[in-house]
Every structure is written in C-alpha cells, then in structure tokens.
C-alpha cells in the first residue's frame, strides 16, 4: 500500500527538489530518445536527472541464480525459528517476503498475529525497532527476523544494537545471498563474515547456522546470554510463487 502513495507523489516530489524529470515511455524507440535527452540534460546542468519508470514498463527478467547448497529455504528457517519462541516473545520481522512467510505460518497454525510487527515498507529498520522494544520491555524476549540485504542496508544500526547490551534481544539474519523480495539481485551476504562483524559491534554471542536443529538450539541458548545475541541463518534463495500478503494492519494487531 505504501507504494501507491509513493507512486502518486513521485513526480511532484522530484520536481519540487528541482530534478529534471522524464517519465520513461514503454515504446522502445521513444525511450531511447528520452534517455539520450536525459543524458544530455545531466551533462548540461552537471547534475542528476530522474527517469521515472511506471509499473509494467519492463518485461519479466529472470535474475542469474545464486548457487547455494543449503538444507533450508528461508521460509523453512522462519518456521523452525518461530516454533521454539516463548509464548510472550515479540517478533519484529523485516519487510517483504520474510514478513509474508511469517504471517502465513501464524495463520496456518491459528496462532494469531498479536506478537508480530511486520516492518512493511521499512527495509533495514527492523533491528532498530526491535532494539527499541527490547529496551522498553526488558522483561520480554524480543526477536528480530532480519534479511541480509536489509541488515547490510542500515548496518550502522547493528553497531548501536551491539553496544546496547540488551539482554532480551536476539537478532537473526536469514541470509540467502540475494534481495529476494525485489527480484533476486545478489547481495554480498555470502561473501562476508556476518558473525565476525556482529562480534566486532559488541554482540555477546554471534553464530552461523544452516540446519533446523542448530538454529533451534542457538535460539534456545540465546535465552541464557547476558547480552545481545546474533544468529546468521544461511538459507537457499527463492520463495513460493503463491505466497500471500498480510491481511491485517499493524493497528489491528
């Protein structure tokens, strides 16, 4: 729903900031002319211009597949994690597919959605929201279900979380090596040592898991940790084509 409003105000917003705006045509010949004119304009003003692309302007494209011989999909990992959470645990879930998968898991199990905050349209902000909740409710276990792309997008928040020493917060990053919610473009998630980064930020424990058993053990062990816990869950890229969207609003939760 946030994209409807963003799309409605996009051109005016750019014009108000004095950007030359070109709405890209879906006619290839006209689009080529527009890009040439836009490029020339950028050179003339020695500054940026905006090419606004409407929905369905481009055809479908399959991104190169990332090879990952891992036992779990992200959805399977989210289900495995949710199975062992305390009854009073709060879950702050990152935007996109992870929130949709968690919502469907709760619906299938008739578990209700009252413990979950789905960070729809707020990529990269889930961990900050989770930290705020953990500080406000120190007696309540709080879990952040994050993605590799989202965590990398606002990694500065991990430094703040690591230095917070919040004893009731566990930060899980479901790392599938791609931006899975917006086309499958690769991240650098599989090329870096996320637990080592988390340790440098001050997380008390930081582990990497790939199996359901190790994931659930790590979550249960996190309850005994005297500080913030980080768990990287390496999973296969991809998601179900028929995954639904949340049918309730945050206010209804």
Regions found by a protein language model. Name each.
Residues 1-2, 60-66, 102-106, 155-156, ...:
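Short acidic, glycine/serine/threonine-rich loops at helix termini
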Residues 2-37, 185-221:
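Conserved thiamine diphosphate
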Residues 15-21, 31, 44-55, 230-232:
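Internal alpha/beta core interface subdomains
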Residues 24-25, 50-54, 92-94, 145-146, ...:
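Short beta-strand segments
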Residues 48-87, 224-253:
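Glycine/aspartate-rich loop-and-adjacent alpha/beta segment that forms the canonical ThDP
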Residues 62-123:
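Active-site diphosphate/adenylate-binding microenvironment
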Residues 100-177:
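Thiamine diphosphate
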């Amino acid at each position: 729903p946030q994209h409807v409003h963003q799309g409605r105000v996009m051109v005016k917003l750019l014009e108000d900031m004095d950007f030359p705006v070109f709405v890209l045509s879906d006619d290839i010949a006209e689009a080529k002319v527009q890009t040439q004119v836009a490029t020339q304009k950028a050179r003339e003003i020695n500054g940026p211009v905006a090419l606004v692309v409407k929905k369905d302007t481009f055809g479908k494209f399959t991104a190169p597949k990332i090879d990952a011989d891992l036992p779990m999909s992200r959805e399977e990992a989210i289900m495995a994690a949710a199975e062992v959470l305390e009854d009073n645990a709060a879950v702050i879930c990152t935007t996109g597919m992870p929130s949709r998968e968690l919502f469907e898991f709760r619906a299938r199990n008739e578990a209700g959605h009252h413990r979950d905050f789905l960070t729809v349209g707020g990529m990269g902000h889930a961990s900050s929201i989770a930290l705020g909740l953990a500080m406000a409710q120190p007696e309540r276990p709080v879990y952040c279900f994050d993605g590799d792309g989202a965590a990398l997008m606002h990694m500065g928040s991990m430094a703040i979380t690591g230095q917070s020493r919040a004893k009731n917060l566990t930060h899980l990053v479901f790392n599938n090596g791609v931006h899975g919610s917006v086309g499958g473009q690769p991240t650098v998630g599989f090329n870096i040592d996320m637990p080592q980064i988390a340790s440098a930020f001050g997380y008390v424990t930081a582990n990497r898991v790939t199996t359901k058993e190790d994931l659930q053990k790590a979550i249960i062990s996190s309850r005994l940790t005297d500080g913030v816990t980080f768990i990287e869950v390496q999973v296969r890229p991809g998601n179900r084509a028929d995954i639904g969207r949340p049918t309730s609003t945050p206010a209804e939760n």
